[in-house]
Amino acid sequence: MIVGHGIDLQEISAIEKVYQRNPRFAQKILTEQELAIFESFPYKRRLSYLAGRWAGKEAFAKAIGTGIGRLTFQDIEILNDVRGCPILTKSPFKGNSFISISHSGNYVQASVILEDKK
């Protein structure tokens, strides 16, 4: 049974402005594994990756119903499976989780669905 659904839309240019003012912003948002992937990319790809992880983590927080206020970005990790699809590899939710991240122009959209294991 679906117990939560969250969606987030993020402008990549807004993330770029924050990142340019404070490059440590990425360390606040990304886990150690996500940060290693982020650092392997050229600048433009870094921005879309960071915006995608931001949107995915915001969507997760909305789906679980707490918002980021009760979670930290470090509580949630989004990596890719062998096909390149994003997956939630770390979160406080114990059921099944499904994530989709889509990029289009200056925008990134993420959707998270949480399903009870029952």
Swiss-Prot record:
It is an enzyme of class 2 (transferase). Its EC number is 2.7.8.7. Its cofactor is Mg(2+). It catalyses: apo-[ACP] + CoA = holo-[ACP] + adenosine 3',5'-bisphosphate + H(+). InterPro entries: 4-PPantetheinyl_Trfase_dom, 4-PPantetheinyl_Trfase_dom_sf, ACPS, Ppantetheine-prot_Trfase_dom. Keywords: Cytoplasm, Fatty acid biosynthesis, Fatty acid metabolism, Lipid biosynthesis, Lipid metabolism, Magnesium, Metal-binding, Transferase. One of its GO terms (biological process) is fatty acid biosynthetic process. This is Holo-[acyl-carrier-protein] synthase. Belongs to the P-Pant transferase superfamily. AcpS family.
